[in-house]
């Protein structure tokens, strides 16, 4: 009983904190230079990370298996992954405007997980035989981490497309720290070198110069984050193949989950390939990543909604009052 109470406390506290963090970040975007609010939001995300970690540890102890056996637990883990991505720039002592993506993503996933739709999964259950393996932690954790990274990178690409194809762009704030330090851990020199070429040209306005810088930052970091997610996805698929061979006697069975995982891998492999061609970088590669954003959600929720295939153990049914 005490473990269930702790789970309830951790989930509601983390959800409340991340809601406050989003409000604070909206205020900092509208009113530039409020250092106190920015620091408070960063501390709030750290508290959110600790609360979600506490939930996962509590459920792990209570259920006696790694908490990634169903959609409810994977959504909580996905929210935890978003909080990790959020804190990486903070560890490197850089301004973190990735929170405009990670904080809403965390509250969306956690809000859906704690909603009434997944009530039947809130209670931990005994693992089905197919999941009683040491590969559970390796395979599922890598897949969920890849979803988090690929979703963040895809959202950065979508933001790039919105800014690039919008005729009139308003940059938040007057300072250029949003453009120089928002998404970089030290690669701002790369952007500065490219932007110095444009600084001396007469046909670009002051606004277009900073607009170009922002687009370059988004393009650079969408590539970095998606590359990391692609590595996680590859490891997850390979470990899943080994696990499938042990559990079902075949490395690949082409069930819906595996098929969409392969499609997801292919889409982002195409994205990385376009990055090797300078003529396809920027908007072209961002379009591919934007398509990948939709594919990820189909891969993640598709089988759970259909409830068919070898991965149907994580499916759920919509509950009604």
From Swiss-Prot:
Function: Required during biogenesis of c-type cytochromes (cytochrome c6 and cytochrome f) at the step of heme attachment.
Membrane topology: Multi-pass membrane protein
This protein's UniProt keywords: Chloroplast, Cytochrome c-type biogenesis, Membrane, Plastid, Thylakoid, Transmembrane, Transmembrane helix
Species this chain originates from: Platanus occidentalis (Sycamore)
Transmembrane residue ranges: 17-37, 43-63, 71-91, 98-118, 143-163, 225-245, 258-275, 286-306
Gene Ontology molecular function terms on file: heme binding
Keyword ATP-binding included in the entry's annotation: no
Protein name from the UniProt record: Cytochrome c biogenesis protein CcsA
Main location: plastid
Gene Ontology CC: chloroplast thylakoid membrane; plasma membrane
Subunit text: May interact with Ccs1.
Cellular compartment(s): Plastid, Chloroplast thylakoid membrane
A single BP term in Gene Ontology: cytochrome complex assembly
Family indicated by similarity: Belongs to the CcmF/CycK/Ccl1/NrfE/CcsA family.
Stored Pfam families: Cytochrom_C_asm
NCBIfam families to which the protein is assigned, alphabetical: cytochr_II_ccsB
């Amino acid at each position: 009983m005490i473990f269930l109470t702790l789970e309830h406390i951790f989930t509601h506290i983390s959800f409340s904190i991340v809601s406050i963090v989003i409000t604070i970040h909206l205020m900092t975007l509208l009113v530039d230079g409020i250092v106190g609010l920015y620091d408070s939001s960063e501390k709030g995300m750290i508290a959110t990370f600790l609360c979600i970690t506490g939930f996962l540890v509590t459920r792990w102890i209570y259920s006696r298996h790694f908490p990634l056996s169903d959609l409810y637990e994977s959504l909580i883990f996905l929210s935890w992954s978003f909080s990790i991505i959020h804190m990486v720039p903070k560890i490197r002592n850089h301004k973190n405007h990735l929170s405009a993506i990670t904080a809403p993503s965390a509250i969306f996933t956690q809000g859906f997980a704690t909603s009434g739709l997944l009530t039947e999964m809130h209670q931990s259950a005994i693992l089905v035989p197919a999941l009683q393996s040491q590969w559970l932690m390796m395979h599922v954790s890598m897949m969920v981490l890849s979803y988090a990274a690929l979703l963040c990178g895809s959202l950065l690409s979508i933001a790039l497309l919105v800014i690039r194809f919008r005729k009139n762009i308003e940059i938040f704030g007057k300072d250029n720290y949003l453009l120089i330090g928002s998404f970089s851990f030290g690669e701002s020199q790369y952007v500065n070198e490219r932007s110095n070429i444009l600084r001396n040209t007469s046909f670009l306005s002051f606004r277009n110069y900073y607009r170009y810088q922002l687009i370059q930052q988004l393009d650079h970091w969408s590539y970095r984050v998606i590359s990391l997610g692609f590595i996680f996805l590859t490891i997850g698929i390979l470990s899943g193949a080994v696990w499938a061979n042990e559990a079902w006697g075949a490395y690949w069975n082409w069930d819906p989950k595996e098929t969409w995982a392969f499609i997801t891998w292919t889409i982002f492999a195409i994205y990385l390939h376009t990055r090797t061609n300078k003529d396809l970088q920027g908007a072209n590669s961002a379009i591919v990543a934007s398509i990948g954003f939709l594919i990820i959600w189909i891969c993640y929720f598709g089988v759970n909604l259909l409830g068919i295939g070898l991965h149907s153990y994580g499916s759920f049914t919509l509950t009604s009052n």
